[in-house]
Amino acid sequence: MKFSIAAIALAAVAVASPVEMEPRTNPSTCNINGNNNGKVVCCNSLIPILGQILCNIAVLGSTCNAGQTVRCCETDANGGLINISLLNCVG
C-alpha cells in the first residue's frame, strides 16, 4: 500500500509540467497610473529643502543609502544627481 501511494505521488510530480511564467519587470521601474513607466529614485530626506531636490535615479539592482527615501517619479531621465521633475514623484 505504501509503495503504491509513493509511486502515484512520484508519478504525479513527474507528470506536472512547468507553467510559463510572466516575465519579471525591470526593478528600476515603478508603477504610476497603472503603467510601469516610472523611475525609482533615492532622495536625501535628512537635508530639509535641498535634499528633496537632490534625487538620484537608482541604478539597476542597487539600493538607496541609509537616510534616503525612495520615490517613484515620472521622468525620462536616465540618471544624474538632480531630478528636475520632482513634482511628478510619488513618495
UniProtKB/Swiss-Prot annotation:
Sugar attachment sites: N83
Keywords per UniProt: Cell wall, Cytoplasmic vesicle, Disulfide bond, Glycoprotein, Secreted, Signal, Vacuole
Disruption phenotype: Does not affect radial growth and multiple stress responses.
Function of the molecule: Aerial growth, conidiation, and dispersal of filamentous fungi in the environment rely upon a capability of their secreting small amphipathic proteins called hydrophobins (HPBs) with low sequence identity. Class I can self-assemble into an outermost layer of rodlet bundles on aerial cell surfaces, conferring cellular hydrophobicity that supports fungal growth, development and dispersal; whereas Class II form highly ordered films at water-air interfaces through intermolecular interactions but contribute nothing to the rodlet structure.
Family under the similarity heading: Belongs to the fungal hydrophobin family.
Gene name of the encoded protein: hyd1E
SS bonds (residue pairs): C30-C72, C42-C64, C43-C55, C73-C89
Signal peptide: 1-16
Organism: Beauveria bassiana (strain ARSEF 2860) (White muscardine disease fungus)
Protein name, UniProt field: Class I hydrophobin E
Induction: Under normal conditions on SDAY medium (Sabouraud dextrose agar plus 1% yeast extract), hyd1E is transcriptionally active during the first 4 or 5 days. Hyd1A is the most active at transcription level under normal culture conditions, followed by hyd1B, hyd1E, hyd2A and hyd2C in order.
Keyword Disulfide bond attributed: yes
Cell location: Secreted; Secreted, Cell wall; Vacuole; Cytoplasmic vesicle
